[in-house]
Amino acid sequence: MPKKFQGENTKSAAARARRAEAKAAADAKKQKELEDAYWRDEDKHVMRKEQRKEEKEKRRLEQLERKKETQRLLEEEDSKLKGGKAPRVAASSKVTRAQIEETLRRDHQHKESPDPAEKAKSHLEVPLEENVNRRVLEEGSVEARTIEDAIAVLSVTEEAVDRHPERRMRAAYTAFEEAQLPRLKQENPNMRLSQLKQMLKKEWLRSPDNPMNQRAVPFNTPK
């Protein structure tokens, strides 16, 4: 009886080696695909993060600009009120105090030495320039078609400034919030922003800076 072959079959060994090599190559390829997919996802995540950061910064700058513009408008309005100036109003044509005084002066000169062609007319019969003054107030519009009307408009302007303080509520509250919110944050560091804003609104209701706490002048108040 012949002896069994004790050595390794070279063909079987070669086949196993090829299978192992193919499996290793397949595993390496799969691992590379997984790594590539991971880095692609990571890149997308980084890009989204950067995009959100840029959008947040853009919103912050826009909000800062709006606050600056609101503060500028509020300071401009306060400056006009302190200086006794009439507020700017939309109108198709405006008459300033200087123009009215100039019109009165010319009218006075005209009465003293009238033109021969105008002797038959009094200064009240000579109309002013069309739409000489049209002042659009917050409650409506007031037109000055004569010198007397124009003077009356100027005389009631200062009274009309604060008849409706609620018109300035939004700008005043924004300025109040910018001034007081940092103080509340410092005094209450553990509170959330929503809680701080609730406290701020309560202070605003009692604040003398609140236009609603200032005495409002009725629209038809007699002089």
Swiss-Prot record:
Keywords: Cell cycle, Cell division, Coiled coil, Cytoplasm, Cytoskeleton, Phosphoprotein
Superkingdom, taxonomy of origin: Eukaryota
Record PTM Phosphoserine, positions in chain: S141, S194
Gene Ontology cellular component annotations, sorted alphabetically: centrosome; cytoplasm; midbody; nucleus
Subcellular location: Cytoplasm, Cytoskeleton, Microtubule organizing center, Centrosome; Midbody
Protein name: Coiled-coil domain-containing protein 124
Assembly behavior: Associates with translationally inactive ribosomes in the nonrotated state. Interacts with RASGEF1B.
PANTHER family per UniProt: COILED-COIL DOMAIN-CONTAINING PROTEIN 124
Compositionally biased residues, Basic and acidic residues: 18-74, 99-126
Family: Belongs to the CCDC124 family.
Pfam hit, one: Ccdc124
One Gene Ontology term of the molecular function aspect: transcription coactivator activity
Reported function: Ribosome-binding protein involved in ribosome hibernation: associates with translationally inactive ribosomes and stabilizes the nonrotated conformation of the 80S ribosome, thereby promoting ribosome preservation and storage. Also required for proper progression of late cytokinetic stages.
BP terms from Gene Ontology: cell division; transcription by RNA polymerase II
Residue ranges that the Swiss-Prot or TrEMBL entry lists as coiled coil: 15-82
Region ranges (Disordered): 1-126
